[in-house]
Amino acid sequence: MSDDIHELKKTSLLEFWNSEKMKQVRLDMIAGTPIKECNRCYEYEKLNVDSLRVTATRYDPNLSKIINNMSEDGSLLSMPNYFDHRTIHCNFQCISCGSFYSSTHINLKKEMWNVDDDFVIDHQYEKQSGIDIIESLNKKECTSLYWAGGEPFMSHVHWSVVDHMYNLSTKDEYKNYIKNVRVHYNTNLSKSVWKNKKIVDLINFYQPSIQASIDGTHETFEYCRDGGNWETTSKNWEEFYSYLNKNRQFGIASVLSSPVIMDIDRWFDFFEKYDPLLYNHRYIVNVGLAKQMSFLDIKLFPTHIFNRVVNHAIDRFSKSELRGKHNTINILESYIIERNERVSEFENNKFLKDIKAQTMNRDKYLKINRTYDQVLKIIDTEAYEWYMNI
């Protein structure tokens, strides 16, 4: 995601779409001029890792047509055909997440650091976001919908759009159109029911692409996805996969953090047989807050452990036939590049002690009773012994 465009915060879709800011952004992008809010994408691309803009444009066959129809001043007569809606409502407090993306982290932030986030849900703005998508569907302008969070299956906006899509799909003039709208999700798969109805039954009619946000399996999953239960999630995976994979579109989006990489053999034991599309992510420190940094970062481990686990993970993916594996390999290789560039920082003993203290402090607020060091003891004895001696 880009950084916030503060001057356009909570403007209407019409105001935003052809604002002076967005017109200039389009002109700059076509000219190859860097956009200051897009630093994250540029960082990824320099490391040979797919950025959000790369993945988004890959699935848009109309992109060249849209660019060709752009006016000289950067304005567009056509309205958006791609909607990316991210709710903040969530039931997990994932270790790799933060208060920008999860409502549970807003409460955690206050509890851990006595920082009172003045965030208030703007229900009218949320409702209008859903109306914008519905109006685009009515006009047959929308070609792609991305739902993320938070947890999208907890979002009333999401379900209002799904209900409308279903109603449109029953009409002859919309049946084929709705069928061809590409809908994809980033979901933690903790929810299987909405208002006493099975979610798979409610969304089956458009066969979305599920990008399951699941970090590892068993103890690794339950630590990384703090608040999650592996038995429930693995059961939901089975159910969603059996209903929503008619076009081999089911996928997984794991954050490649240290426990996930160290526990990669169990990851393969569970997921490989399903042949999921890979949408795995780099581990990043959210919103640049140093106090959020933890030993989820594999680059913090000493060279001999880092090389062993990262190269083993690269080897597992290289030898697999999983679709999308090349970007996952690129992510793992980007860790090697970054660590080599900052080796003195990652091996600084005071720095490591500070990060360990932050990790231990975060562990005091876990919803589960298994701390980071206890997970390490299960998945990698050598890493556990080194960590305990910091």
Predicted regions and their residues:
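N-terminal pre-core extensions flanking Radical SAM catalytic domains
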Residues: 1-121, 138-139, 328-390
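Radical SAM enzyme [4Fe-4S]-AdoMet core and its adjacent flexible, acidic
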Residues: 1-11, 106, 123-128, 202-390
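Non-transmembrane alpha-helical segments in soluble domains
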Residues: 14-17, 94, 159-166, 238-241, ...
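A general structural signal for short secondary-structure junctions and capping/turn motifs
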Residues: 29-32, 73-75, 136-137, 174-176, ...
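Core AdoMet radical
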Residues: 77-89, 98-128, 140-158, 169-195, ...
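Active-site catalytic pocket residues across diverse enzymes, especially alpha/beta-hydrolases
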Residues: 101, 165-169, 244, 275
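Conserved RecA-like ASCE ATPase "motif II neighborhood" in helicase/translocase motors
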Residues: 129-133
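Distinct, well-ordered alpha-helical segments
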Residues: 159-163, 194-201, 263-267
